[in-house]
């Protein structure tokens, strides 16, 4: 039986730039950073104590997927406060905080154009 999500692959053009973005701007921590092949490393990040890894890696032949990841949602206690904090760090938002009946959300993108949702719990 499936127990949890082990990792999610985030396609990236420049692993060093993506690593700096996710760790310095978003506060992810490095779980693994090791050579994978001649061109790339296996970089796996974590958020807090979550068992799910975020892997900054693009398999050969899948470069067309860079910038197409969409709608991964990150839970935060306060969308507006997190928006202000990340916006102050230079994170680019495509949608400022919006309140809906189901909660508040905002959408930002990483340096490759992959988009993620900040969502209230």
Kindly label every feature range from the protein language model.
Residues 1-19, 69-72:
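N-terminal beta-strand motif that seeds the catalytic metal site of vicinal oxygen chelate
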Residues 9-52:
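Core segments of cupin and vicinal oxygen chelate
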Residues 14-15, 65-66, 71-115:
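Vicinal oxygen chelate
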Residues 45-50, 108-111, 120-121:
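Active-site beta-strand termini and strand-to-loop segments that position acidic
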Residues 48-53, 62-64, 79-81:
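Short, charged/polar surface micro-motifs in flexible loops or helix N-caps
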Residues 54-57, 116-119:
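Conserved beta-strand in the GNAT
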């Amino acid at each position: 039986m499936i127990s949890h999500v082990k990792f999610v692959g985030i396609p990236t053009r420049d692993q060093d730039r993506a690593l700096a973005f996710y760790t310095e701007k978003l506060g992810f921590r490095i779980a693994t950073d090791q050579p994978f092949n001649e061109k790339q490393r296996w970089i796996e990040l974590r958020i807090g104590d979550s068992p799910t890894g975020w892997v900054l890696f693009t398999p050969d032949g899948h470069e067309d997927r860079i910038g197409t990841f969409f709608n991964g949602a990150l839970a935060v206690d306060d969308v507006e406060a997190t928006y202000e904090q990340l916006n102050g760090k230079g994170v680019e938002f495509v949608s400022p905080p919006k309140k809906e009946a189901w909660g508040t959300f905002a959408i930002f993108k990483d340096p490759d154009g992959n988009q993620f949702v900040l969502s209230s719990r």
